[in-house]
Amino acid sequence: MTKPITVQPGVQLRDADKMALIPVKFLPEQEGEQLKKPDWMRIRLPKTDEKIQNVKNIMRKNNLHSVCEEASCPNLSECFNHGTATFMILGAICTRHCPFCDVAHGKPLAPDADEPKKLANTIREMALKYVVITSVDRDDLRDGGAQHFADCIREIRLASPNTRIETLTPDFRGRMDKALDVFRETPPDVFNHNLETAPRLYSMARPGADYAWSLKLLQKMKELHPDLPTKSGLMMGLGETNDEIVQVLKDLRAHGVTMLTLGQYLQPSRHHLPVKRYVPPQEFDELKAIALDLGFTHAACGPFVRSSYHADLQAQGQEVK
């Protein structure tokens, strides 16, 4: 009989331990069962890792986290080599346990009250002109962590007034009104919240989340700040159909979203949701054309695209794929 998983405060649960807590069960893949990666999914590594190590050292020195490392992003080498990173606030332990995500699950510790200042000082030290701030889900906090986001935005603007700030937030489920009240006074320059996948796959891929709730959050933020660009992202390769993706795009536009990212899902380990298929680059191009026809002003679509991948270029409307 399998020993029950005990969740202790501050302890990170990953892979099999994390998946054991998910209500929708699936068997981990065995060796040889994974789909073979096509040639277009091969990553070119930089010739030297000096810049990569420099970014990591700065993060360690200030006791900060990057979603690039915590979520095992395939673009880590490229982004760190360019001196950029997506900062993950509110700790490295998520209260959700989505089976596509490599971020650790568990009972997080109290937020670090000094994190906003440390984050702002780090961004100033790195001389960043565009930053993306994301977080784990914090269902244990009364406002879902919204005030911590606002504190970070405020400190960054004090330290680096010319730096543009994009926030990639959780859904603040059950706490939307409190979160919106916080963002009313301290909005970012771009507000991003990912739908991740088609609603049919939510019970499997996003347990604890709600498709309509996420759409409402995006809509409410746009209503509060009509000139604020709102953004959302989707993964492909989880078993969705292209027709389902197009319907999600229509739903996003109906809720005022103007910026879009579409990328290929990659399985972090054999314990995570398997890749159902690798979507060829030409399909991403076709979906981008549909997105632009639907009225999206920005659409970054390609196998390696992630929400924060070259987010500064995305915001400028440049080609990212």
Swiss-Prot record:
InterPro entries: Aldolase_TIM, Elp3/MiaA/NifB-like_rSAM, LIAS_N, Lipoyl_synth, rSAM. Binds 2 [4Fe-4S] clusters per subunit. One cluster is coordinated with 3 cysteines and an exchangeable S-adenosyl-L-methionine. The keyword RNA-binding does not apply. Its EC number is 2.8.1.8. Coiled coil: none annotated. [4Fe-4S] cluster 1 binds at residues 68, 73, 79, 308. Pfam families: LIAS_N, Radical_SAM. Its cofactor is [4Fe-4S] cluster. SMART domains: Elp3. The keyword Signal does not apply. [4Fe-4S] cluster 2 binds at residues 94, 98, 101. PROSITE patterns: RADICAL_SAM. One of its GO terms (molecular function) is 4 iron, 4 sulfur cluster binding. One of its GO terms (cellular component) is cytoplasm. Belongs to the radical SAM superfamily. Lipoyl synthase family. HAMAP family: Lipoyl_synth. This is Lipoyl synthase. It comes from Tolumonas auensis (strain DSM 9187 / NBRC 110442 / TA 4).
